[in-house]
Amino acid sequence: GSSVIVPVRSTPAGQIQNFTVLPSTSAVQWGTFYQVIGMANAVLKYAPGVIEKDESYYQSQMDSHLTEAYFLRGLSYLYLVRNFREVPLITEPYVDDAMPTDVPKSSEVEILEQIKSDVRAALATDAAKETFNGTWATKGRATKWALYALMAETCLWAEDYEECVTYADYLINSTAPIRPVFMSTPGQWYNIFYPGNSNESIFEIQYDETNYAQGGGSPSKLLPYGSDVTVNTYMYSEPMTIRLINEFYQNQDEVNRTYYGSFAGITYTSYPENGIIWKYSGLGVADREAVRTILDANYIIYRMADVMLMKAEALIRIGGSANWTEALAIINRIRERSELRPRDEVSAENINEA
């Protein structure tokens, strides 16, 4: 069996696993993020000038577009700071050769403050939408809810815990008629991932293989390598697999078919050692095979469970028995939806384990 995830040796994931990362390794390059940042910078700089030249481009449209540009720039920088900590901070578009290309790195603090400034600027326009026309747009474009989620995560990363709670509560306590909501019924979780764009979703990258030939790849597909590995499975952590089985409410057979599954009728009897990760099993499908020919599942950036756990972590970091109790209540809502046993004790010693 295997106690670690074992990627293919020649892939970027394999290079990371084997500590052989090079500057050319695609998984550690930040160019794509700066492409997004560059486009956002161009919108922020030139959109105001378009109004002067195009009478059909209204102020309300421009303000709405600016909120989306602020969000995409902020989200890109948050991913960069989480992965690289210090990166070049660029807020102007590259339009000619006069722009510098050798830009020094900015500090983590500077970048986080820029993200906060972008979110505040977006919200200050009062043009951030709660919904767009069509579910895919509401979940796939930057809404007011997405801005709140981005700010909550940025504040959590910056250790501004009180502000994190504030922005998380803007989502959790909202009474807007159309808003993201936590899906508390255990059987509903499946809809979050398939078909996606669920009520719980806040922002997710849209893929559509059927209509637009778009595919997100298979980020969880890690194949074994080595002559001693003969099973055609995803290698999964044996200790964590056993721990999940022990904590799961449902019986062994239910765990096996909904969590492990099988490929094209191949049956595996040694589940903890050779577990198969199968997200799209659904319910009541003990004899159904899971074969997907396309890889266009949306990539979920934020959903309500994420925001709730952000608030819980912030409350834990703030400290105090009242905050710990509230944090544990939030965590238990997530656990109970996953049909895991709730935790009923809270102390300075165990709160971080909840």
PLM feature spans:
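Conserved, well-structured interaction surfaces
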Residues: P7-F84, S106-E110, V119-F132, V285-Y299, ...
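Cytochrome P450 fold signature focused on the C-terminal beta-domain
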Residues: S184, R341-E349
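Short coil/linker segments at helix-helix boundaries
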Residues: E86-V109
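Elongated scaffold/linker segments in the mid-to-C-terminal portions of large proteins
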Residues: G1, V8-T32, P48, D169-G319
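Short linear capping/connector segments at secondary-structure termini
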Residues: V21, S56-Y58, E92-M99, W136, ...
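Aromatic-residue-lined binding/catalytic grooves and analogous aromatic/hydrophobic interfacial grooves
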Residues: G1-V21, N41-G49, L78-E92, L112-W136, ...
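A glycine-rich, coil/turn loop motif that links secondary-structure elements
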Residues: Y58-T67, N133-A146, S347-N352
